[in-house]
Regions:
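Amphipathic alpha-helical linker/stalk segments
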Residues: 28-31, 35, 44, 64-94
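Short hydrophobic/aromatic patch on the recognition helix
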Residues: 46-56
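Hydrophobic/aromatic-rich alpha-helical bundle segments in the mid-to-C-terminal region
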Residues: 146-194, 202-213, 231, 235, ...
Length: 253
């Protein structure tokens, strides 16, 4: 006898298929550099506007879901090293290739965040759902955790995580790829050089506590150069980010 499928099961499957169709269409459009409105997404997917809006009531809701779907493995990252410098490199090596693969979605998320910031300044977005994420903070806090276990002041470790947050995410990709024209390999070299300088400078300031940084034995002279360069870069970039982004609440990864 043929198997009878109940109406609720059929409806549930249809909804799942429709949601997946919308997500895949949105991802394809974003990767082509097209940031679609919900109406444009509906047209491209062959569904009604009402259906598309039922799944994604705003561009912010759409982008948030697309980012979650495409970067899911990054959010589950767990370190394997006990060295802060090695942990940070692990995170960069693990996350950035996937971020590059879904760069269109991440750029769209940044665009949404900046648009919402502008609306907030103009007092026009009180009822609009905010696009806010905190994964960057969680992942970088996990990366610098060995410093705290080794006896470094938690406030110092937190400041390092804050500085590293300027090197991890869409903003760094935009600056180094768009302004400097770097390819992915060059981009990764610069990011890892900067992150190592920050880690080593922090450990030098903290007295090289318990070798938590993996590579802190670079020498007082080298650490001093790294410290000065890292401090200047962190201060300058932080100032620019604060002026352009309107706060750390808007995070993509």
């Amino acid at each position: 006898m043929p198997t009878t499928v109940s109406a609720p099961e059929t409806l549930s499957e249809t909804r799942t298929q429709t949601r997946e169709l919308l997500l895949q269409t949105a991802l394809s459009m974003l990767e082509q550099g097209w940031f679609p409105s919900i109406t444009e997404l509906a047209n491209a997917s062959g569904v009604s506007r009402a259906t598309a809006y039922r799944y994604f009531p705003s561009q912010a809701a759409l982008v948030s879901t697309v980012v979650d779907e495409s970067l899911g493995p990054v959010l589950q990252w767990q370190p394997t090293s006990t060295s802060v410098e090695a942990r940070v490199n692990e995170l960069l090596d693990f996350a950035y290739p996937r971020m590059e693969q879904h760069e269109g979605a991440l750029r769209a998320a940044l665009q949404v965040a900046l648009h919402q910031w502008a609306n907030e300044r103009a007092r026009r977005a009180q009822d609009e759902p905010k696009y806010r994420r905190g994964n960057r903070r969680r992942l970088l806090t996990l990366a610098v955790e060995p410093m705290v276990r080794a006896g470094v002041d938690p406030a110092v470790a937190e400041r390092l995580a804050q500085a590293l947050s300027l090197l991890y995410g869409t903003e760094a990709m935009v600056v180094l790829k768009d302004i400097w024209g770097l390819d992915f390999r060059q981009f990764m070299n610069v990011i890892k050089w900067m992150s190592s300088a920050l880690v080593r400078a922090t450990l030098a300031q903290a007295g090289g506590a318990a070798g938590a940084g993996g590579g802190a034995e670079a020498g007082a002279g080298g650490a001093g150069v790294a410290e000065g360069a890292a401090q200047g870069a962190a201060e300058g970039t932080a100032e620019g980010t604060a002026a352009a982004g309107g706060g750390a609440a808007r995070e993509q990864v």
